[in-house]
Curated annotation (Swiss-Prot):
Location of the protein in the cell: Secreted
Origin superkingdom: Eukaryota
Reactions catalysed according to its record: Selective cleavage of Arg-|-Ala and Arg-|-Val bonds in factor IX to form factor IXa
Underlying gene: F11
Cysteines joined through disulfide linkages: C20-C103, C46-C76, C50-C56, C110-C193, C136-C165, C140-C146, C200-C283, C226-C255, C230-C236, C291-C374, C317-C346, C321-C327, C380-C500, C416-C432, C514-C581, C545-C560, C571-C599
Sites where a glycan is attached: N90, N126, N450, N491
Protein source organism: Bos taurus (Bovine)
Protein name: Coagulation factor XI
Post-translational modification: Activated by factor XIIa (or XII), which cleaves each polypeptide after Arg-387 into the light chain, which contains the active site, and the heavy chain, which associates with high molecular weight (HMW) kininogen. Activated by F12 (activated); the presence of negatively charged surfaces accelerates activation. Activated by F2 (thrombin); the presence of negatively charged surfaces, such as polyphosphate and dextran sulfate, strongly accelerates activation. N-glycosylated on both chains. N-glycosylated sites mainly consist of nonfucosylated sialylated biantennary (in high abundance) and/or triantennary (in low abundance) complex structures.
Entry's family note: Belongs to the peptidase S1 family. Plasma kallikrein subfamily.
Function: Factor XI triggers the middle phase of the intrinsic pathway of blood coagulation by activating factor IX.
Reported disease: Defects in F11 are the cause of factor XI deficiency in Japanese black cattle. It is a hereditary mild bleeding disorder with an autosomal recessive mode of inheritance.
Length: 625
């Protein structure tokens, strides 16, 4: 079948510029604007590739029916346009769409789908036997160099190749081509899903240079940006950053992206003014997107200029850059004149790879990056402006991840607390459901401060599924943790926002600011409170906690918080609610309110499910196939 071009333009032009368009247009092709061509197993994956490409705004994907030439099948054509859109023409078998950079919802590079009868081609560097495609996928996920895989089933025509798991990679991280092949299954590494078991090394080592193969060099203002660039480069495993004080002027601010056959540096040398570290691609549930809110003073980022506008401040300049979909970074030059009202010049810029082409210092300017991609990160890491006010009563928006879980039978009432951890997921305590027989009687209310706000017409989320840890027996024995899957996904707002799960790599973090929140009793014989209560509580070692609960065993699955002298504590009605701790300006869900003796009794701290110990279980249930 030949390509069918019918020059019939769709009415889809400037009206969509800068807007979020999620529709995929069947039998349609964007005309012009080609940047590069990749290969993808379907249009949705092509959209993911476009979204994470520094310049792609639109794409066209070619299905099998688009051409009689199989080499053109599965091509993903990435496109750009100064007007942010392109004319669209009819083309049989083509599917077109827009990058999700314009969208406010969470975007992930995670792709768990399996593609039956597709052979995704690349360099086959490892071959082994596996029992299933899932086993092969996990093997790829746990291999440092693997980008994608192909598994030959037990019905594969060649007997000697049956159950073979081929691990593959390419320079770009995407297949070099995709062909039809019966009795094979292909898929991608799940590293970007946060499901790798490889070691996660978060340290950045000062006065250190790594050797081995340098696969690319880019400009970066600091080692943290360099690490982000390495993390999102398909082949970068570790990096060395040369600071602005590096003795060779032409090499200053260079970010050297590196790899090795072993996956680790073969040697490291002491070098002043150099910093080295590792990609975070292997880190579980914490792979960040390129999001940097820092301002770099007395610094000029060079690149292709998109526009020059007036701005009151560097913050306003960054906002303008963020609101311009093609802007990747900016430089703000403060005004030296008083006649223009103090406005400075805001230079909006971009480059082929999303990084400055050169970085100059001592210019008096202030530079930084767009925040547009920050929403694509695990949104919980956004440094939301929560303010902890005095007293014991919370205010609106103070704890945007806190929910109140109501049961409607026999009469509607507050049952437990819980925490938003995803747009369709609530983490709470298993013991809340000891008497609940069906999710149909549950309602989740978010953004609520006072229970009295809840009326018959107050919007809520229905619960599709209750997932209780299969090892749960009773709260005092541990495993007191449960997930609620909502019937519909929520949109994030200032009063409805997820909290981060703690990373398994952060087990030794010393949290110094922890708060427990809920509508529970303030004393043993009391009633549910109308206004959301809060209490700042210190974490306690399990040994200290065990001393107060000799009749129970305090395990690593539990974490305790409270004061030795008693007083502030969680109580009845707080169950399932969050123990929220702040670290590096990011809030983490350290505990889920589980059990305790009394309310705020001396040497009887509150006992919480230790969330970090359940991260794998949470990810399995919320991100599993």
């Amino acid at each position: 079948m030949t390509l069918l071009y019918q020059m019939v333009h769709f009415a889809l032009f400037a009206s969509v510029a800068g807007e979020c368009v999620t529709t995929l247009f069947q039998d349609a092709c964007f005309k012009g604007g080609d940047i590069t061509v990749a290969f993808a197993p379907n249009a949705k994956h092509c959209q993911i590739i476009c979204t994470h490409h520094p310049r792609c705004l639109l794409f066209t994907f070619m299905t099998e029916s688009s051409s009689e030439d199989p080499t053109k099948w599965y091509t993903c054509i990435l496109k750009d346009s100064v007007t942010e859109t392109l004319p669209m023409v009819n083309m049989t078998g083509a599917i077109s769409g827009y990058s999700s950079k314009q969208c406010l919802h969470h975007i992930s590079a995670c792709s768990k789908d399996m593609y039956v009868d597709l052979n995704m081609k690349g360099m086959n560097y490892n071959s082994s036997l596996a029992q299933s495609a899932r086993e092969c996928q996990q093997r790829c996920t746990d291999d440092t160099h693997c980008h994608f895989f192909t598994f030959a089933t037990r019905h594969f025509p060649s007997i000697k190749d049956r159950n073979t798991c081929l691990l593959k990679n390419t320079q770009t991280g995407t297949p070099t081509s995709i062909t039809k092949l019966h009795e094979v299954v292909s898929g991608f590494s799940l590293k970007s899903c946060g499901l790798s078991n490889l070691a996660c090394i978060r340290d950045i080592f000062p006065r250190t240079a790594f050797v081995d193969i340098t696969i690319d060099t880019v400009m970066a203002p600091d080692p943290f940006v360099c690490r982000s660039i390495c993390t999102h480069h398909p082949s970068c495993l570790f990096f060395t950053f040369l600071s602005e004080e590096w003795p060779t002027a032409s090499e200053r601010n260079l970010c050297l992206l590196k790899t090795s056959s072993s996956g680790l540096p073969s040697a490291r040398f002491r070098k002043n003014r150099a910093f080295s570290g590792f990609s975070l691609q292997h880190c579980q549930h914490s792979v960040p997107v390129f999001c940097h809110s820092s301002f770099y003073r007395n610094t000029d980022f060079l690149g292709e200029e998109l526009d020059i506008v007036d701005a009151d401040s560097h913050e306003a300049c960054q906002k303008t850059c963020t609101n311009s979909i093609r802007c990747q970074f900016f430089t703000y030059s403060p005004s030296q004149e008083s006649c223009n009202g103090g406005k400075g010049k805001c230079y909006l810029k971009l480059s082929a790879n999303g990084s400055p082409t050169k970085i100059l210092h001592g210019t008096g300017s202030i530079s930084g990056y767009t925040l547009r991609l920050c929403k694509m990160d695990n949104v919980c890491t956004t440094k939301i402006k929560t303010r902890i006010v005095g007293g014991t009563q919370s205010v609106h928006g103070e704890w945007p991840w806190q929910i109140t879980l109501h049961v409607t039978s026999p009469t509607q009432r507050h049952l437990c607390g819980g925490a938003i951890i995803g747009n369709q997921w609530i983490l709470t305590a298993a013991h809340c459901f000891n008497e609940v027989k069906s999710p149909n009687v549950l309602r989740v209310y978010s953004g609520i401060l006072n229970q009295s706000e809840i009326k018959e017409d107050t919007s809520f989320f229905g619960v599709q599924e209750i997932i209780i840890h299969d090892q749960y027996e009773k709260a005092e024995s541990g495993y007191d943790i449960a997930l609620l899957k909502l019937e519909t996904a929520m949109n994030y707002t200032d009063s409805q926002w997820p909290i981060c799960l703690p990373s398994k790599g952060d087990r030794n973090v010393m949290y110094t600011e922890c708060w427990v929140t809920g509508w529970g009793y303030r004393k043993l014989r009391d009633k549910i409170q109308n206004t959301l209560q809060k209490a700042k509580v210190p974490l306690m070692t399990n040994e200290e906690c065990q001393a107060g609960y000799r009749e129970h065993r305090i395990t690593s699955k539990m974490v305790c918080a409270g004061y030795r002298e008693g007083g502030k504590d969680a109580c009845k009605g707080d169950s399932g609610g969050p123990l929220s701790c702040k670290h590096n300006e990011v809030w983490h869900l350290v505990g889920i309110t589980s059990w305790g003796e009394g309310c705020g009794q001396r040497e009887r701290p509150g006992v919480y499910s230790n969330v970090v110990e359940y991260v794998d279980w949470i990810l399995e249930k919320t991100q599993g196939p």
